[in-house]
Curated annotation (Swiss-Prot):
It comes from Nostoc sp. (strain PCC 7120 / SAG 25.82 / UTEX 2576). It holds the Pfam family Aminotran_1_2. Its cofactor is pyridoxal 5'-phosphate. GO terms for molecular function: histidinol-phosphate transaminase activity; pyridoxal phosphate binding. Belongs to the class-II pyridoxal-phosphate-dependent aminotransferase family. Histidinol-phosphate aminotransferase subfamily. Gene3D superfamilies: Aspartate Aminotransferase, domain 1, Type I PLP-dependent aspartate aminotransferase-like (Major domain). The keyword Amino-acid biosynthesis applies. Its EC number is 2.6.1.9. Homodimer. It catalyses: L-histidinol phosphate + 2-oxoglutarate = 3-(imidazol-4-yl)-2-oxopropyl phosphate + L-glutamate. The modification N6-(pyridoxal phosphate)lysine is found at K236. This is Histidinol-phosphate aminotransferase 2. The gene is hisC2.
């Protein structure tokens, strides 16, 4: 290891955005990418044409992008009010910060709260891994608690004990995903009560990356809870994963701090233009959601009928599939083999935390996924 590199990074494992495709083996001719929870649908051609015109006629490539994002922030605030059914104007541009993906916002939150030994973070695993990864890159301690293996509810007794016993440094941020990834379950009433009971000295970050699929938001809590921040993204339902646009909704004082620590010109002009076009045409982009939810139901029903598979209900655009503990195929080796068989067949899914996280794709992709899994489970090499 190079002598000028921090020693704690020697054993650090970097995040692999597409771990299923991280291979030198031949790529199947038919590849269904269901491993990163993206939308299976590209932007409509007319919106791409509009963006192409914007790039040619409006964007000056030799100029830095809009560093203040005021137009985009105002458009986001309007959408947040609309999506939460808030009749009076509650959120404005002062409540919004925009990042190069939600990852940048998470990193900015960590810098603003925990750096220099000021604090540690609490997560309930399995959950979105970037909270822990970004904290580790900054030298911030990560405290982990578990979830119920049956319904994936957070172990609140362990979480409360962690809050009380972690003193050097104390827990300053609690991260939750609503609904959670990879398990797809929303926050429970007990979890919400616990989050509301936390001291105002603790920042509660509620990641609503999959809000458009769950239609369950906690933004109305922000008026009474200045220590809460809501994260959202354009990468899922808005079909802009390639543009890397995330945003958060919070108290204006929290937003002002985030603006201090974020990088200047953090969003390219084309990303800003894409997000604005997406918001202006949200009715068109979001009309695919009912079909995604219908396809999700079909997959859950189909997998539930298989004697070796366990699949929970989902409030997101993905499902979490596990092998039943009492089946002949319940070993970790069997799961690894199943994952490899799917990859060989041209279906990329994410193997994580004792299961497979499968993004809901197009109807054709979902049929292939179902067939590939059913075929793989009857192969002799998958028997544990």
């Amino acid at each position: 290891m190079l002598p000028f590199i921090r020693s704690d990074l020697a054993q650090f494992n970097a995040y692999k955005p597409h771990p299923s495709s991280d291979t030198a083996s031949a790529v199947p001719p038919q590849l269904d990418r269901l491993d990163t929870n993206e939308s299976p649908y590209d932007l409509p051609p007319e919106l791409k044409q509009k963006l192409a015109w914007t790039f040619q006629q409006v964007i000056e490539s030799n100029r830095y992008p809009d560093g203040g994002h005021e137009t985009l922030k105002s458009a986001i605030a309007e959408y947040v009010n609309e999506s939460a059914n808030i009749s009076s104007l509650r959120f404005t541009a002062a409540n919004i910060s925009v990042g190069n993906g939600s990852d940048e916002l998470i990193r900015s939150l960590l810098i603003a709260t925990c750096l220099s030994g000021e604090g540690s973070i609490l997560v309930a695993n399995p959950t979105f891994s970037m909270y822990g990864i970004l904290a580790q890159t900054l030298g911030i301690p990560v405290v982990s608690v578990s979830r119920n293996p049956d319904n994936f509810a957070i172990d609140l007794t362990a979480a409360q004990s962690a809050i009380e016993q972690t003193l050097n440094p104390p827990i300053r941020v609690v991260f939750v995903v609503h609904p959670n990834s990879p398990t797809a379950n929303p926050l429970t009433a007990n979890e919400l009560r616990w989050l509301k009971s936390l001291s105002e000295r603790i920042l509660v970050v509620v990641d609503e990356a999959y809000f458009e699929f769950s239609q369950n938001t906690l933004v109305s809590e922000l008026a009474q809870r200045p220590n809460w921040i809501i994260l959202r993204t354009f990468s899922k339902a808005f079909r802009l994963a390639a543009m890397r646009v995330g945003y958060c909704v919070a108290h204006p004082e929290a937003i002002a701090i985030l603006e201090k620590v974020r990088l200047p010109y953090n969003l390219p002009s084309f990303s800003i233009a894409s997000a604005l076009v997406a918001l202006q045409n949200r009715a068109i982009l979001l009309e695919s959601i009912p079909q995604t939810l219908d396809e999700r139901t079909k997959l859950i029903n189909a997998f539930s009928q298989h004697p070796a598979l366990a699949v929970a209900e989902s409030a997101a655009n993905f499902i979490f599939l596990r092998l039943k503990a009492d089946s002949d195929n319940s070993s970790d080796t069997t799961l690894l083999n199943l994952h490899q068989q799917l990859k060989n067949s041209g279906t990329l899914v994410r193997q994580i935390s004792g299961g497979l996280r499968i993004t809901i794709g197009t109807p054709e992709e979902n049929i292939r996924t179902l067939n590939h899994i059913q075929t793989a489970l009857i192969k002799p090499e998958l028997v544990g």
